[in-house]
Amino acid sequence: MALFSSQAQAFNQTRQTYLARELALANTHWTRLRGLLGTSRSDFRNGCGLWIVPCRGVHTLAMRFAIDVVYLDRAQAVVHIEQDLRPWRFAPVRLQAASVLELPCQTIAGTGTAVGDKIEISLGKDARRQLD
């Protein structure tokens, strides 16, 4: 199960709105492979998210709920979005993506997030150490 932290957040600078106020980081082989597997829909509530680095595509195999997916380039600009990706599906691989945000359904629609938006990822000190 992903460990969501209120110290790590994803903020849409273009729309001036939060995509995730509690963000988990998946940046090792194991955490990227596991992703949200084992996370319940009630644990993955509005305001939560998973940032997968590096990542160019995702799947929802063995998941029990749908998600929204935001693909980010190296500058953390949105290059593609997938809304309501249902369980047992593959999202397209986007070669221009450097990372992906997995979010609860309706996050993209609720925030108005669109291709070209700039996303700021702020990490707590523990998460920053994991990226180094």
Question: What would you call each of these model-derived segments?
Answer:
Residues 1-132:
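Compact, glycine-rich, soluble single-domain proteins
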